[in-house]
Amino acid sequence: MEKSNMIWSILLHLGSNMWAKKERELCSPVYKDYDDDFVYRDHMHCDREVWRKVTEFLPECGINTVIVDIGDGVVLDSHPEIAIDGAWTKDELRADIKRMRNLGLEVIPKCNFSCGHSAWMKEYAYMVGTETYYKFCDDVVSEIIELFDTPRFFHLGLEEEDADAQKNQPIAIVRAPAIKMRDALRLFNVCISRGTRPWIWTDQRTIDAFGGDEAFRSQMPREVLHSVWYYGIIRDTEGVLETNSAAKAFKKLADWGMQQVPTCSTWSWHLNAKDVVRICSKYIDENSIKGYMMAPWQLTHKNKYYSLLNAAYTLGVAREMYYGKD
């Protein structure tokens, strides 16, 4: 991958209901009335001014791509019933996409279709496996692709769909591997048929949820873009590709001929971006590395403003250290 064509991206949240379903506080009292990013909200939490200021800062850091986590944060024509109070209209989002593109940013949509991150779907989250559910998914993906003027990619999530990841939810839904693969292939086909490449989270846990290494390697379309996410320390020591779970996953995807955008964060280790970019630039086949993503996991709110700026800046620093400034 030529340096000039690489993706240097950040995940920003428009909607916020990708984690806690309604009544989660009945299972985990800590979430009740708790000022946390991962509670269910029936109103918009995204601060428009913070959104604008953060996105305007990105080019200064060398960030060239924004992944917009939409969820229930926009009023869709096909399913206005899922939108929360204060959700952006399509015209508002369309105008903001134009503004960001004028800044030189590529704008990529994201909606998470994992059963473990489906609070934004409202009642459709509990209809998995039905024709109503499949029509809902098709409608949402198709309308968003049109809204974003056929983007290069559509991030579909699809991670953390197991019982342990949903242990604090009021209702946990886990698809059998064959069903999860079938449903994912359906989503992929909706994207590909409309000229957009699918993009998913791909750690070993997700690979196992799809049926394990062989099923994933043999059935996963090569059009799909992958993001292994790892937020801890990666020591550049002898044998790191065998001892560190993320490094192993980066190499595994490369060996399988899959393109990837390794994902870092300031969530738990402030130098994680440097670690991830160093390991991948040094050890992983450059033809597999499409770019990198910063996922701060901080909502777009005034209380998180400086955290978001710092996250973007740290990825920019890592980019300059290992790929140069230009």
Feature names for model-found ranges:
Residues 90, 243-244:
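Active-site-adjacent beta->alpha loops and helix N-cap segments on the catalytic face
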Residues 117, 151, 155, 164-168, ...:
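Charged, low-complexity C-terminal accessory regions
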Residues 12-15, 202-204, 229-231, 264-267, ...:
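Structural motif
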Residues 11-225:
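Aromatic-lined carbohydrate-binding surfaces of glycoside hydrolases
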Residues 256-326:
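Substrate-binding cleft of secreted/luminal carbohydrate-active enzymes
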Residues 1-9:
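N-terminal amphipathic alpha-helix/helix-capping segment at the start of soluble metabolic enzymes
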Residues 125, 199-242, 249, 269-284:
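Substrate-binding cleft/loops of secretory-pathway carbohydrate-active enzymes
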Residues 195-197, 219-225, 254-260, 286-289:
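Glycine-enriched alpha-helix->loop->beta-strand junction motifs that scaffold or abut catalytic
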